[in-house]
Amino acid sequence: MKVTALGNTLTGFGQALATTLGVDTTSSSPNCAEMMVVFARGTSEPGNVGLFSGPTFFDALEVMMGAGAVSVQGVEYGASIEGFLQGGDPAGSAAMAGIVEGTVQNCPNAKIVMSGYSQGGQLVHNAAAMLPAATMAKISSLVIFGDPNDGKPIANADPSKVMVVCHPGHNICDGRDLVLVEHLTYSRDAVEAATFAAARAKA
């Protein structure tokens, strides 16, 4: 119960900060585009794409791919501390897998990016393991910021399509559960990550 209360407090703080900064923490774009990003936010982040890495990543992709070329669908899931401690929310993992499968079926010509931050990275790992190899072969790139599973391969994914961004000394990337300042600075890696995803899309 205390863990849940803490998570709710952090989510409220994150949404207040996002509002102050004018950052949109929710994205639902089912329409097909040249690039389709399926993104899972981190634990206790607001909205469905969060604040600390997703929005800046999407903005950088839009610059590189062109106006209107990028569509983003955030994964709706609890993003609770309990889910993180489970290795990634099971329902959220299944939801992400379902969104990716549906996107592959409905937008066969799109360049699909699976991405997540922190617990969202766990969802990327879990969803990839749930999806058939034929579906994963159609994924253009996979980008994870602050991966709790850092160093573990993503199931059914070509390693050349994978980019994992982890800062030195980042407690979460080291397999622990203490959130320090390194965990909150992944927006600075947006351009590097977007450059990778855009290059993969154009390969």
Curated annotation (Swiss-Prot):
Q: Which reaction does it catalyse?
A: cutin + H2O = cutin monomers
| Expression induction | By contact with cutin.
* Name used for this protein in its record: Cutinase pbc1
Alphabetically list the UniProt keywords: Disulfide bond, Hydrolase, Secreted, Serine esterase, Signal, Virulence
Q: What does this protein do?
A: Catalyzes the hydrolysis of complex carboxylic polyesters found in the cell wall of plants. Degrades cutin, a macromolecule that forms the structure of the plant cuticle. Allows pathogenic fungi to penetrate through the cuticular barrier into the host plant during the initial stage of fungal infection.
List, alphabetically, the GO terms of the cellular component aspect: extracellular region
At the top level, the lineage of the source is: Eukaryota
Q: Which GO terms describe its biological process?
A: carbohydrate catabolic process; symbiont entry into host
The species is Pyrenopeziza brassicae
Signal sequence span is 1-18
Q: Check the record and name the InterPro entries matching this protein.
A: AB_hydrolase_fold, Cutinase/axe, CUTINASE_1, Cutinase_monf
Which molecular function terms from Gene Ontology are attached? Answer: cutinase activity
* Main localization (coarse): secreted
Disulphide bonds annotated for this chain are C32-C107, C166-C173
* Organism phylogeny: Eukaryota, Fungi, Dikarya, Ascomycota, Pezizomycotina
Reported phenotype of the disruption mutant: Abolishes penetration of the host cuticle. Abolishes conidiomata formation on the host.
The subcellular localization recorded is:
Secreted
